Each structure stands twice: as structure tokens, then as C-alpha cells.
């Protein structure tokens, strides 16, 4: 699809739902072992920073910003629907649980800006927050570029 066709395609979606969306799946590695509280702090900060960046760049409403982290010894989920209230984080890690490697799935839905802007703000937030917390990451799948389009077009 050419750039002009893609712009028209995006505008059609904009008129239909006015929602900007982004999702990604990644692997995370902590060079130093993280406690569950450190992981929760990083995950909560990630959702807050993504949401704030989207709002600062034109979003006027949070649909849902959520993340699911899975490590060998447990899982953690975080959800944010109101920036003022902050994220809600749940997990099944034991009190002394630690991890170094995990999978992270992230979904971002906001109102008022388009997918490319949501993607850009999300990726910049990931870079900023993970760097601050000393986390390395590798994006396994960027659903904005692949499955999103295929699913939409019946692929």
C-alpha cells in the first residue's frame, strides 16, 4: 500500500473509532536480578509514562493501557485506565521472588491520536523507562506493523 493509500486507510479508521492503538511483545533481561517490587515499579512507571506521553501528544482519553509480564516463576499484570489514579498491578510472585528474564506483552489504546503516534510515544517510553531501570529488551513482534494489518484485512 502506498503512502497516500495508507493515509486514506488510517483516516477511514479514525472516522470509525477515533482510537489509536499499539501492541508489542518483547523479551526483557535484567542484568541484575530484580525483586517483584522493583518489577512492579518498572511496569507501573512504563504504563504511566506511555499514557502521559500519549496525552501530551494529543490523546484526550485513555482507553486502556495494559501489560502482562511472564517470568519462569510467576506473572504480573498491570492496567491503567485513568492517569490520575495510576496503574493497578497484580501478580502471583512469592514475597521473595526475583527474576532476570521475562516476556512482556503491551497493549495501548487511547482516544484522540492515531496509531503511528501511539506507537512512537510507546516505543520512546519503553526506551526511557527501561534504560532508567537498567533493563535490556528485544522486541519480538510489533503488532502495529504486522498482525494488525493482516487481521484487519482477513489475512
Name what the model sees in each region.
Residues 2-155:
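P-loop NTP-binding site
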Amino acid at each position: 500500500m502506498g503512502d497516500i493509500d495508507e493515509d486514506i486507510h488510517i483516516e477511514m479508521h479514525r472516522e470509525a473509532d477515533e482510537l489509536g492503538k499499539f501492541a508489542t511483545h518483547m523479551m526483557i533481561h535484567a542484568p541484575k536480578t530484580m525483586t517483584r517490587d522493583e518489577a512492579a515499579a518498572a511496569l507501573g512507571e512504563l504504563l504511566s509514562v506511555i499514557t502521559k506521553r500519549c496525552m501530551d501528544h494529543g490523546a484526550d482519553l485513555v482507553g486502556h493501557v495494559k501489560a502482562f509480564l511472564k517470568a519462569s516463576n510467576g506473572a504480573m499484570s498491570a492496567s491503567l485506565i485513568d492517569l490520575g489514579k495510576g496503574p493497578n498491578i497484580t501478580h502471583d510472585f512469592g514475597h521473595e521472588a526475583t527474576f532476570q528474564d521475562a516476556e512482556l506483552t503491551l497493549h495501548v489504546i487511547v482516544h484522540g491520536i492515531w496509531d503511528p503516534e501511539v506507537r512512537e510515544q510507546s516505543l520512546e517510553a519503553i526506551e526511557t523507562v527501561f534504560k532508567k531501570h537498567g533493563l535490556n529488551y528485544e522486541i519480538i513482534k510489533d503488532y502495529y506493523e504486522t498482525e494488525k494489518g493482516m487481521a484487519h484485512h482477513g489475512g
